[in-house]
Amino acid sequence: MATLTPRQQQIFDLIRDTIRNTGFPPTRAEIAAEFGFSSPNSAEEHLRALARKGVIELTPGASRGIRLKVTRSDSERPDQFSLPMPGVLQLTLPLVGRVAAGSPILAAEHIDRQYQVDASVFDERPDYLLRVRGLSMRDAGILDGDLLAVKKASEAANGKVVVARLGDDVTVKRLKKRGDTIELIAENPDFQNIVLHAGRDEFSLEGIAVGLIRSSGF
């Protein structure tokens, strides 16, 4: 395992803890603010150093495109989802592919397969995995083909990444609520945000994102 400088260890720990608490890594700007760096470019330099040492992987062009490749903690708790490991408690979760218009997201015809993941990586237990379609959440590190771990919920706090149903469509976006206005925010400037009005637009929450499995190998 690579030896990290004290500052690199602090940044690694911040990334790990942010993933545990929110399901997603911090942005460069958030890292810079946490450590008092003059700009996000300083955070980028530290991230590249961590990547060179092989402890993280960076996704080009994504502000939250940071993936942990190793665990550095006393408990050696995995921070990323992985294939099943012998002797580790596994969760069996349904993997949802394309969702047909007007039908429940966990309807049998939507289940591509059952998938096993290490239970210890979740602070909140997910109910299912959803295969992501498209790049509207690219800058949150959520890419086309990735598997989003989702906990069923009908309410969510501002800033959470959610699975929402809009009429007959299901989408993954970041939630922002202001009074009766609901905004579903894309994490990619090539996509428009969706603005809705409670009581007037057909909208419901299907769940909250609690983690991510990168698509490579699936």
Swiss-Prot record:
Residues of the site described as Cleavage: 101-102
Sorted UniProt keywords: Autocatalytic cleavage, DNA damage, DNA repair, DNA replication, DNA-binding, Hydrolase, Repressor, SOS response, Transcription, Transcription regulation
DNA-binding region: 28-48
GO molecular function, one term: DNA binding
GO BP: DNA repair; DNA replication; negative regulation of DNA-templated transcription; proteolysis; SOS response
Keyword field contains NAD: no
Entry-linked InterPro entries: LexA (IPR006200), LexA-like (IPR039418), LexA/Signal_pep-like_sf (IPR036286), LexA_DNA-bd_dom (IPR006199), LexA_repressor (IPR050077), Peptidase_S24_LexA (IPR006197), Peptidase_S24_S26A/B/C (IPR015927), WH-like_DNA-bd_sf (IPR036388)
Entry EC no(s): 3.4.21.88
Keyword flag DNA repair: yes
Residues at the catalytic site: 136 (for autocatalytic cleavage activity), 173 (for autocatalytic cleavage activity)
Pfam family, one: Peptidase_S24
Functional description taken from the UniProt entry: Represses a number of genes involved in the response to DNA damage (SOS response), including recA and lexA. In the presence of single-stranded DNA, RecA interacts with LexA causing an autocatalytic cleavage which disrupts the DNA-binding part of LexA, leading to derepression of the SOS regulon and eventually DNA repair.
Family the UniProt entry places it in: Belongs to the peptidase S24 family.
NCBIfam families, per the entry: lexA
Assembly with partners or alone: Homodimer.
Name recorded for this polypeptide: LexA repressor
Organism of this sequence: Cupriavidus metallidurans (strain ATCC 43123 / DSM 2839 / NBRC 102507 / CH34) (Ralstonia metallidurans)
